[in-house]
Amino acid sequence: MKKPYPIIVMTILSFLSLNSSAQEVIRLRSCEDNSIIKQADSLKNMYANDGFVLLKEASISMESEYEMPVVVPLNQGSWYQFVFIGDYTSKLYEVRMYDWNEKQVVFQQKRWGDVDGNVISYSYIPKFSEFHMMKPVQVNKQKKKNLCGYVMLFKKAGQNTGNASITASDNKKSNL
């Protein structure tokens, strides 16, 4: 008598693979917005004057209400400054940062109309040398796609800069 288990297992796996391939994935694409570039240049000068070195920067094309995960290796005890600049027409800007254990270590939110509302900037000194994930998101009711965002990672000068790199990973819809 033949065992039905292999057939059942194969059927379940085929359904799971169909379901997972149907999910939308947003790929990292750059964008260009002159007002964001001017803001980024101004912030780069300000942080350079404060003794920070720019490790990485990237312009990213985003969709409204979708997170754009950015993964970076951070060194224990080093002082980092992370900056996210969103499209000035968006109504809400948010950044969450998680450590390797997926514990949320930073949360910042700004709304349109706040002073520097489209810029979120925060300092962070990691307790461990490990990868961290930043998840910037912006909400825009008029433009759903092709929102420009800009991320920058700075490190306090005089500290080992290592090989930090910004990497975008697959996106999941924000829980707003």
Show where each model-derived region lies.
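Bacterial Sec-dependent N-terminal signal peptides
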Residues: 1-26
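Residues within well-ordered beta-strands of beta-sheet-rich folds
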Residues: 79-83, 133-135
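Non-catalytic, beta-strand-enriched accessory regions in extracellular/secretory proteins
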Residues: 52-75, 79-81, 175-176
